[in-house]
């Protein structure tokens, strides 16, 4: 079973501003995120002796973990640069941090994801023909959902989308790839997020409110989506089964869900794959209000990639930490003790599911 040591916990979660950060390079953004996470738990940055980060897509660098370490003035005993894809990158960072601390390679680890994707100079990339990818009408009809517009970002002062949106606004947005419109697609964002981990014993000694990772599971089924003959048989369901089994819970036992939402259809697929609702029922589940604040299991109360910012899904994890510590402000889910976080990299190429809990 893919269990995670309960003797290592998350004690700090930090975010930079998101949106446009002109003039800031990725190393500055990542450093800012680490500083915010350290401040969140009252840690001095020089106490960090483990550093795990992302090599930015905007302007790729070699040895970027040592670049960031040098910029922060650290002398870490453990370094790693991770890129698995989407929120699964953040999960893999956390797994490495747990292993590094548990094995004595470091005592305090920082995991950081951030870059200047919006204002930087990303290399050319080939676009995806989403209509061909999704198969057109066969995706629209089973789910019956033409658009999911979340108001949660209005409750998040650090969100890129801060204006209310009506159904008329949504329907007036241009079609990108039928049935997906502009507002079915996530943001392009500058920004960063970071997490601080240490042993449970050290956290207790410091009097810190902590969050544990109860379980984590992943599965990769392909790289190119052309190698997936059936788009309804993806790694998300397998990762979810493993993560829930290892945690000894099911989706109904979670009080909040942070699901990767690069596109609205990603949420529909994930809700069904993880068993929050049955096949073809995700649209009904959302329209019934089960995923709204005050509903059965609120979904992405920070606004997600669609409305807060697309920082590779790292802000899904920082939001989970805030929800479980009761520090999410106006968007706090009352009584949140357990969160389910999902991620996918590429076109569901690699899928991951993580169960997180508030420490008692």
Which residues does each PLM region occupy?
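Acyl-thioester C-C bond-transforming condensing/cleaving domain
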Residues: 2, 43-45, 62, 74-232, ...
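Metallocofactor- and cofactor-centric catalytic cores in central/energy metabolism, strongly enriched
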Residues: 5, 21-32, 44-53, 59, ...
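Generic N-terminal amphipathic, Lys/Arg-enriched alpha-helix
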Residues: 7-22
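Conserved beta-strand elements of the Class I
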Residues: 9, 49-52, 110, 255-258, ...
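Phosphate/pyrophosphate-binding loops at sites that engage ATP/ADP/AMP, CoA/4′-phosphopantetheine
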Residues: 35-48, 239-253
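A short beta-alpha structural unit
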Residues: 51-54, 216-219, 255-264, 305
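Short, surface-exposed loop/turn segments at secondary-structure boundaries that line and modulate
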Residues: 55-64, 220-223, 261
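Feature representing long, continuous alpha-helical segments
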Residues: 238, 242, 252, 261-269
């Amino acid at each position: 079973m893919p269990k995670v040591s309960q003797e290592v916990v998350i004690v700090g979660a930090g975010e930079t501003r998101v949106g446009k950060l002109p003039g800031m390079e990725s190393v500055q953004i990542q450093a800012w995120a680490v500083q915010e996470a350290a401040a969140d738990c009252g840690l001095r940055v020089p106490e960090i002796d483990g550093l795990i980060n992302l090599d930015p897509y905007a302007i790729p660098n070699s040895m970027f973990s040592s670049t960031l370490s040098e910029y922060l003035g650290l002398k870490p005993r453990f370094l790693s640069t991770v890129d698995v894809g989407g929120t699964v990158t953040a999960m893999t960072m956390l797994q490495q941090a747990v292993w590094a601390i548990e094995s004595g390679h470091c005592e305090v680890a920082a995991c950081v994801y951030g870059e200047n994707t919006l204002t930087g100079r990303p290399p050319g990339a080939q676009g995806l023909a989403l209509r061909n990818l999704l198969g057109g009408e066969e995706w629209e009809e089973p789910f019956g959902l033409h658009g999911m517009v979340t108001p949660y970002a209005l409750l998040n002062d650090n969100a890129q989308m801060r204006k209310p949106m009506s159904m008329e606004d949504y329907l007036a947005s241009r079609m990108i790839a039928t049935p997906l419109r502009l507002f079915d697609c996530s943001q392009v964002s500058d920004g960063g997020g970071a997490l601080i981990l240490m042993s449970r014993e050290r956290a207790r000694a410091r009097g810190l409110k902590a969050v544990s990772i109860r379980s984590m599971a992943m599965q990769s089924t392909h790289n190119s989506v052309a190698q997936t003959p059936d788009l309804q048989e993806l790694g998300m369901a397998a990762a979810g089964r493993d993560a829930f089994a290892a945690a000894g819970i099911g989706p109904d036992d979670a009080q909040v869900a942070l699901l990767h939402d690069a596109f609205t259809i990603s949420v529909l697929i994930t809700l069904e794959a993880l068993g929050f609702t049955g096949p073809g029922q995700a649209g009904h589940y959302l329209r019934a209000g089960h995923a709204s604040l005050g509903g059965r299991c609120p979904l992405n109360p920070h606004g997600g990639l669609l409305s807060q910012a697309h920082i590779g899904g790292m802000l899904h994890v920082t939001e989970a930490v805030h929800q479980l510590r009761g520090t999410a402000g106006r968007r706090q889910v009352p009584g949140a003790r357990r969160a389910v976080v999902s991620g996918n990299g590429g076109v569901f190429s690699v899928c991951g599911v993580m169960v997180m809990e508030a420490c008692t």
